[in-house]
Amino acid sequence: SIDGSFERMTPVIRASQDAGIAYRGYVSTAFWCPYDGKVSPEKAADVIERLADMGVTDVSIGDTIGKAKPDEVRALLDVVLKRVEAGRLAMHYHDTFGRAADNVLASWDYGITIYDACTGGIGGCPYAPGAAGNVATSTVVKTLRAAGADVPLDLLAIERAKNEIIGYLGTQRQPDPMPTEQPR
């Protein structure tokens, strides 16, 4: 349960604070749940705010099954940003339906500058059957650069790392999707 999770996290957060260690809290399935369906922005915002109030350094908002659309990202951020400042939020997108780049762009428009990403878009979630990997690092970089952001990462180095990882894992190379929406 959500309450049980908070109960288990409390001593970990306190210990990290006592040790001066930054601690990121994660809110999974903030948009859609594989078991319960659509999550209301208010319900997700309640959990995000509660976690922020516990003193975590920042809160990562997860689209764990990759089903969120940009309008749903905007709807959630409209509620959350009345409670928690943008600088304390990170976004965690999966690219199951090819919308992660558009969702990065939607959250960037709200002042979000922290994104969980993975080289090659690998990953997934054992609790969300069928969910694709995390949004590819190169997709985030290209999307934010297209929106005018200065992202000081070497795309060639990312591509080399991606090819090495994919070669090692023996998986298929995934294309890096670009947003279909335009920067605002």
Regions picked out by a protein language model, each given a short descriptive name:
Residues 1-184:
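Catalytic cores and adjacent flexible loops of soluble metabolic enzymes
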